[in-house]
Regions:
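N-terminal extracellular/periplasmic Venus flytrap/periplasmic-binding protein-like
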Residues: 10-12, 22-32, 40, 174-266
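Beta-strand segments within the central parallel beta-sheet cores of soluble alpha/beta enzyme folds
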Residues: 46-54, 82-86, 111-116, 176-181, ...
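Flexible glycine-/small-residue-enriched beta->alpha junction loops
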Residues: 110-163
Length: 275
């Protein structure tokens, strides 16, 4: 039986909704992080024959080609296998599993796995235009919100959080306390530079010139119980889930370079982890 090892693990900094990464389409962002992950692994990109990319939200014309465009931009061969998977919140994890399975089955010696999502670029869909909206207003569906909405009528994922809070007896104060601790830990780790080694710096073109984006912008330093207590429920009257204690809407990418352990050892490559 083959063993699968991780040769590199690289991510972008996390961009907040409509923040620094909002101007990059997923295929471009994925390509930048792909390329850095491959460079750090020490593997020739032409040797990597398999890639799986987790991606959910429709964005623009190259949405369906996010895996192929990312791999080509990273220097992989046109002969390589590249496909996207949508398992909603677990898409990136499924991508890692799928790439690892390809190695275990002998379909590849080296593979990429991870995901990219730019929620800020979620498309608005207008189904009526296909057959011709002949007169009057027509509906525009927010694809980003649609992905966050239960397809069987329960509602937004925020309602799922409300239902779980009731089911497990999790109070508003407990949720706020967890959020404060999470924000403060993130802020402390950023201040101490603990994430620098895992982040691929991204050069962004702006009106003021090139700007290097290499620090998570979503965490809010200085968050307190007092500030969170002032926030109103976001999804349900008299609910407990707010914009301050709920999961954030953000943008980013993260990828592993995976390898068969025996092949990596023969090539003199040192793994950082084992699956």
């Amino acid at each position: 039986k083959r063993e699968v090892v991780v040769l590199s693990a690289v991510r972008s900094a996390v961009g907040t909704f409509n923040g620094a990464l909002a101007g990059m389409e997923p295929a471009e962002l994925g390509g930048v992080v792909f390329k850095e992950a491959i460079a750090r692994s020490g593997v020739d990109p032409k040797q990597i024959s398999f890639a799986t990319v987790g991606n959910c939200i429709p964005t623009e014309s190259r949405y369906a080609y996010v895996a192929r465009v990312s791999t080509i931009q990273a220097g992989m061969s046109m002969d390589s296998v590249a496909f996207a998977v949508n398992r909603l919140c677990g898409s990136s994890q499924q991508a890692v599993v799928s790439s690892a399975q390809a190695i275990l089955l002998g379909d590849a010696d080296f593979a990429l796995g991870g995901g990219v999502e730019v929620m800020s670029r979620g498309a608005y869909l207008m189904p009526a235009l296909r057959s011709g909206a002949r007169m009057g207003d027509t509906q525009a569906i927010d694809a980003m919100v649609a992905v966050l909405t239960d397809p069987f009528g329960v509602g937004h994922m925020g309602i799922t959080a409300e239902n779980l809070a009731v089911k497990h007896g999790i109070s508003r104060e407990q949720q706020d306390a967890f959020a404060v601790e999470s924000q403060n830990r993130a802020a402390k780790a950023i201040a101490e530079g603990r994430f620098k080694s895992q982040i691929a710096p991204i050069t962004l073109k702006t009106r003021k010139g090139d700007v290097v984006f290499d620090t998570d912008e979503h965490p809010r330093a200085g968050t307190t119980m007092e500030t969170l207590a002032k926030m109103k429920p976001a999804f349900k009257k008299d609910g407990t889930v707010t914009a301050g204690n709920a999961s954030g809407i953000n943008d980013g990418a993260a990828f592993f370079v995976l390898a068969a352990a025996d092949v990596a050892a023969k090539a003199g490559q040192k793994p950082i982890a084992r699956l």
